[in-house]
Each structure stands twice: as C-alpha cells, then as structure tokens.
Amino acid sequence: MKAMILAAGKGERMRPLTLHTPKPLVPVAGQPLIEYHLRALAAAGVTEVVINHAWLGQQIEDHLGDGSRFGLSIRYSPEGEPLETGGGIFKALPLLGDAPFLLVNGDVWTDYDFARLQAPLQGLAHLVLVDNPGHHGRGDFRLVGEQVVDGDDAPGTLTFSGISVLHPALFEGCQAGAFKLAPLLRQAMAAGKVSGEHYRGHWVDVGTLERLAEAESLIGERA
C-alpha cells in the first residue's frame, strides 16, 4: 500500500517557527515532525510515499530527498497555491495509482501503528477517530459499530485524526483545483461507504506552539 503525507500547510499559528521553516520540518523533540511519520510508515511495511507541499516546499524535498535513508521511495506533488486537502490529494492521484492508499496529515504526531491499516478496504474510506481534544470539543463524526456517520450536537462524537485509508474512487467526478476532503467523506458516509475505528492511544494535532510542547512531553515520556 502506498501512503500520502499532507504537508502543504503554512503553519501560520506556529509562527515565528514557520516563517522560514515549513511546518513538517519543525523539530519536535529534536526530530522534524514529518520524520516520525516516515519512520512509522517504513516500520509498517510501506515502501512508497507521496508528499504534497506548497509553503517553502523545496526545503522539504531538499531535506528528505528520495527517501532512501528511511527505507522509502518518496515522490513529491508540488502545489503552486495550496489546494486544500481534497484538491491536494486529487492532484497527487496519478502518483498514488488505482489501489487504496494510506493518508496522514503531516502536522499530527501519534504512536498509532500504521500496520493496522493494511487490511483490505471495505467501501471508499476508513477513518481513524480519536477522543475530542480540548480545542475541538464538538468533534467531527460519530462511530456506529464499524461505520462512520456525520457528527451532530449530541454527546459521543469523535475527532478525525487525519489518518485514513482512501480509495481513489472517492474522487470520481472531481475537478482540478482547491477543495476540501470533508464533503467527499460526508457524501460517502451517507451512502454507508465509510468505516472507522476509535484509537485511544497518543495523538496530538501539532498546530500551535502549545500543542508542540504537548507532543514533546509525550515523546519524552516514551524515551
């Protein structure tokens, strides 16, 4: 299974760290954030990774190269202007092929074992959901058995971790340009084609300096 890491965000909430460094290369406990994903993907048996980028993206290519030092083959999907999640994935589909692929947001840190996602995909998407963090109390979706449905205001919603397996058919009918992933997922949910799981391990959306410190604390505990 191929994997894609979303790495095109500007990281504006992490300034000044991201003024001259793309967020995926910001050090977390002494290691660029994106390298945690690359090492975990390689450990899970992934061999081919696609990374999209926009803001200071050449730095990402220069730092990671062809991926061989991680035991991976890395290809890049540069974006002149950020295409948001859906548009960025759609642009990279020719590099990802026709089979389901693993997707992970480049700005999260987690101890999730990506090998758990190697099982055959049933439907169009499989989402890893986590408990709602304090900064996202309403959550995103709801897990009913093994099916994911859209969230609501009632208790019991969960947050999309940014980790998933997607089938390229999810993007049928899409056009090139900037668009979000969430509407496509909700459309597939309405058709009963999105499965999911609730992960209760460590997961941090490293989107602010405070949450960067939280991730570093968790990594320190594991050392």
From Swiss-Prot:
Residues that, per the record, bind Mg(2+): D107, D205
What's a Gene Ontology MF term here?
carbohydrate derivative binding
Query: What GO terms in the biological process aspect are recorded for it?
Result: cell wall organization; N-acetylmuramic acid metabolic process; peptidoglycan biosynthetic process; peptidoglycan turnover; regulation of cell shape; response to antibiotic
Q: Which UniProt keywords apply?
A: Antibiotic resistance, Carbohydrate metabolism, Cell shape, Cell wall biogenesis/degradation, Magnesium, Metal-binding, Nucleotidyltransferase, Peptidoglycan synthesis, Transferase
Note how its activity is modulated.
Is completely inhibited by EDTA in vitro.
Is the tRNA-binding keyword given for this protein? Answer: no
Q: Locate the residues binding substrate.
A: N105, D140, D205
Q: Give its E.C. classification number.
A: 2.7.7.99
Q: Give cofactor(s), names only.
A: Mg(2+)
InterPro entries reported for this sequence: GlmU-like (IPR050065), MurU (IPR054790), NTP_transferase_dom (IPR005835), Nucleotide-diphossugar_trans (IPR029044)
How this chain assembles, per its entry, is: Monomer.
Record PANTHER family: N-ACETYLMURAMATE ALPHA-1-PHOSPHATE URIDYLYLTRANSFERASE, NUCLEOTIDYL TRANSFERASE
What is the role of the protein in this entry? Catalyzes the formation of UDP-N-acetylmuramate (UDP-MurNAc), a crucial precursor of the bacterial peptidoglycan cell wall, from UTP and MurNAc-alpha-1P. Is involved in peptidoglycan recycling as part of a cell wall recycling pathway that bypasses de novo biosynthesis of the peptidoglycan precursor UDP-MurNAc. Plays a role in intrinsic resistance to fosfomycin, which targets the de novo synthesis of UDP-MurNAc. Is not able to use GlcNAc-alpha-1P and GalNAc-alpha-1P as substrates. Cannot accept other nucleotide triphosphates (ATP, CTP, TTP, or GTP) than UTP.
Q: What is this protein called?
A: N-acetylmuramate alpha-1-phosphate uridylyltransferase
